[in-house]
Amino acid sequence: MAPNLRKSHPLLKMINNSLIDLPTPSNISAWWNFGSLLGICLATQILTGLLLAAHYTADTTLAFSSVAHTCRNVQHGWLIRNLHANGASFFFICIYLHIGRGLYYGSYLYKETWNTGVILLLTLMATAFVGYVLPWGQMSFWGATVITNLFSAVPYGGQTLVEWAWGGFSVDNPTLTRFFTLHFLLPFMIMGLTLIHLTFLHESGSNNPLGIVSNCDKIPFHPYFSLKDILGFTLMLLPLMTLALFSPNLLGDPENFTPANPLVTPPHIKPEWYFLFAYAILRSIPNKLGGVLALAASVLILFLAPLLHKSKQRTMTFRPFSQLLFWTLAANLLILTWVGSQPVEHPFIIIGQLASLTYFTILLILFPIIGALENKMLNY
């Protein structure tokens, strides 16, 4: 009998073992769809990004007008740009839901997979930040100035570090060109990291909603989950297309329609919505270095998730108190996101500080305590 090429060819064999004959737990829910959705987001962003880069000029005098030219004169340039800008938002929606799923179902106990995932998140955040600077509008310029300035909080070498990052004494042409370089490079780095992430995942196999070993009940990835993934793609690409075609500027800042002007500061500098929770945490501490450390901690805290797991059960499926805490954390993040978009004045300052405190308290203190408490409850 002739060997099946899909199973014998050196390259096809790898694809087969990852996407076709992969043994998958039969009970994984729609929460397991976000990994493949992130893959689609990455592919879409790289494709639209390459097409945009072909028409973009990384120069302070030309950047803004080159983006306007792309939207006005390039065939479907407006659509490519709108898909790219809003695709970033969908990328972050998917990654936040993917991380939330990981926290809820204890996926962080696959430490290598989890750690590469957190590194992927950090790389994605860096990519989105440098990308936002490229259109060289007011918010691009001032966002770059404010965020890069945070490095000056580093003791001793801070100022030198910032000037080195800027390539001068302020955000200017060298900054824009290096940000374009980074924005072009990082997505390919994300692609490489994604392969590592998947390699680690396929070492152990997928987790499942019950958090128990599922070797006795696995089904092939194709056709079951390949079809389920295609449904997921449709359900994500439909709202993306709707947003890009009907209200492409809904999530953007109107300030960015004004070309960058170093002499005029916008009344309220704020990042895109997906960074607002971290921005709120940064602002809640009235000290530069403290704020920077809190900002870094807000994301780096994810590395600690495996160490803070004290429960005998892997997932939160049968842990009502942990569930309550988890959804409190989710609501708290929404509050932080809202506070980050508000001006720094009376009610918002204290709300932001309380929400920041709650965020760290839940993750660092309450989750381990409740986990240990639920273990005790198993005895009764």
UniProtKB/Swiss-Prot annotation:
GO biological process annotations for this chain's record?
mitochondrial electron transport, ubiquinol to cytochrome c
Top-rank taxon of the source lineage equals: Eukaryota
Give binding positions for heme b b562.
H84, H183
Binding positions (a ubiquinone): H202
Name the needed cofactors: heme b
Provide the binding site for heme b b566: H98, H197
As for membrane topology, the entry says: Multi-pass membrane protein
Q: Does the keyword S-adenosyl-L-methionine apply?
A: no
Q: Does the keyword Membrane apply?
A: yes
Per the record, its GO cellular-component terms are:
mitochondrial inner membrane; respiratory chain complex III
What are the protein's GO molecular function terms?
metal ion binding; ubiquinol-cytochrome-c reductase activity
Provide the alphabetized UniProt keywords. Answer: Electron transport, Heme, Iron, Membrane, Metal-binding, Mitochondrion, Mitochondrion inner membrane, Respiratory chain, Transmembrane, Transmembrane helix, Transport, Ubiquinone
Q: How is the cofactor bound?
A: Binds 2 heme b groups non-covalently.
Q: Where in the cell is it found?
A: Mitochondrion inner membrane
Q: Which residues cross the membrane?
A: 34-54, 78-99, 114-134, 179-199, 227-247, 289-309, 321-341, 348-368
What else does the entry mention about this protein? Answer: Heme 1 (or BL or b562) is low-potential and absorbs at about 562 nm, and heme 2 (or BH or b566) is high-potential and absorbs at about 566 nm.
Q: Which family does it belong to?
A: Belongs to the cytochrome b family.
Sum up the protein's function in the record's words. Answer: Component of the ubiquinol-cytochrome c reductase complex (complex III or cytochrome b-c1 complex) that is part of the mitochondrial respiratory chain. The b-c1 complex mediates electron transfer from ubiquinol to cytochrome c. Contributes to the generation of a proton gradient across the mitochondrial membrane that is then used for ATP synthesis.
On subunit structure and binding partners, the annotation says: The cytochrome bc1 complex contains 11 subunits: 3 respiratory subunits (MT-CYB, CYC1 and UQCRFS1), 2 core proteins (UQCRC1 and UQCRC2) and 6 low-molecular weight proteins (UQCRH/QCR6, UQCRB/QCR7, UQCRQ/QCR8, UQCR10/QCR9, UQCR11/QCR10 and a cleavage product of UQCRFS1). This cytochrome bc1 complex then forms a dimer.
Q: What is this protein called?
A: Cytochrome b
Q: Which organism is it from?
A: Antigone antigone
The UniProt gene name for this protein comes to: MT-CYB
